[in-house]
């Protein structure tokens, strides 16, 4: 891992230099299962499943052994300039260090009310806590199925993960409004405002609340296809296959954002506002 380390005075133009000094440890188990539960003259069914359990931890970041040392690595769009995620020895990369949200007796979040962990009467950087949650999933898996009956064939593929946490940056940045959202004038208003009920300006620390740290475990059905093959359509035993397919069919997740699978981003901060497209297609294949 690359990390900035402090250098002796006069050894460089600055007091820090980017160095390949860090190290990381990965432990895990991979497995796969492929079964054919049905195999007859007309019917065929095969199912495949693969999974990976993984445990990733940083083991070294700099030359010192200070257990309190950590490197800030990821920020969010609002707030007071501090970063949200850190690299720290003993934790997964990009572990979140948020503030802990306070709630009322009905379970609703209280705006600008965060846990004062050090008891000094102020909310400062010292009140953040080590969540132990990161955007690196603890479990990956994939699923495929193939079914055929005479000239018909059907297939699907999907994948997902579990123990996967992301910070909903869009929700954090748009969690408050002094507009009456119940007036029916803004049907496309950000859903997060209805969820929080915040109406006052957010304090800087509110944007870093664990209210916006969500379990984004999901299952995505990547594609399905259904086809029919016309056989012996010519003197040369040709075939014609007509097929329908769909990609990005659906996603099952409790995540409140647009898509739990952040595109082009592995640091766990979701600021994507464009949905992933769903595609339908019809194909005709001729074989002679």
PLM regions with names:
Residues 1-13, 42-47, 52:
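Membrane-embedded beta-barrel scaffold of Gram-negative outer-membrane proteins
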Residues 1-6, 53-72, 163-189, 252-261:
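Outer-membrane beta-barrel and related beta-rich outer-membrane complex signature
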Residues 2-8, 15-24, 60-64, 86-87, ...:
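Extracellular/periplasm-exposed beta-strand and loop segments of Gram-negative cell-envelope proteins
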Residues 11, 18-27, 71-97, 103-108, ...:
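C-terminal beta-signal and terminal closure region of outer-membrane beta-barrel proteins
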Residues 19-25, 29, 36-135, 254:
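Conserved small-residue
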Residues 27-37, 45-53, 141-147, 152-160, ...:
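Membrane-embedded beta-strands that build the outer-membrane beta-barrel scaffold
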Residues 63-73, 87-88, 92, 99-101, ...:
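Membrane-proximal, glycine/serine-rich, low-complexity loop/turn segments characteristic
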Residues 108, 161-247:
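Extracytoplasmic gating/loop element in the C-terminal half of outer-membrane beta-barrel translocons
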């Amino acid at each position: 891992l690359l990390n900035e380390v402090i250098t002796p005075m006069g050894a460089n133009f600055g007091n820090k230099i980017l160095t390949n000094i860090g190290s990381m440890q990965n432990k895990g188990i991979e497995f796969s299962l492929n079964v054919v539960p049905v195999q007859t003259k007309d019917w065929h069914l095969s199912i495949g499943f693969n999974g990976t359990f993984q445990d990733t931890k940083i083991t070294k970041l700099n030359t010192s052994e200070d257990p309190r040392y950590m490197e800030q690595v990821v920020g969010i769009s609002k707030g007071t300039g501090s970063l949200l995620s850190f690299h720290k020895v003993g934790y997964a990369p990009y572990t979140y260090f948020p503030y802990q949200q306070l709630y009322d007796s009905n379970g609703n979040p209280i705006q600008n009310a965060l846990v004062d962990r050090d008891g000094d009467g102020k909310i400062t950087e010292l009140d953040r806590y080590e969540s132990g949650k990161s955007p690196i999933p603890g479990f990956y898996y994939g699923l495929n199925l193939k079914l055929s009956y005479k000239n018909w064939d059907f297939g699907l593929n999907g994948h997902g993960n579990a123990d996967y946490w992301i910070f909903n940056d869009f929700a954090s940045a748009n969690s408050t409004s002094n507009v009456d959202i119940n007036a029916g004038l803004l049907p496309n208003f950000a859903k997060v405002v209805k969820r929080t009920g915040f109406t006052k300006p957010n304090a800087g620390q509110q944007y870093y609340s664990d209210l916006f740290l969500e379990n984004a475990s999901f299952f995505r059905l990547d594609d399905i296809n259904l086809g029919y093959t016309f056989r012996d359509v010519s003197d040369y035993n040709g075939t014609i296959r007509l097929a329908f397919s769909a990609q990005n069919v659906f996603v099952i997740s409790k995540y409140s954002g647009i898509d739990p699978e952040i595109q082009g981003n592995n640091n766990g901060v979701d600021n994507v506002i464009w949905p992933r497209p769903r595609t339908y297609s019809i194909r005709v294949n001729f074989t002679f």
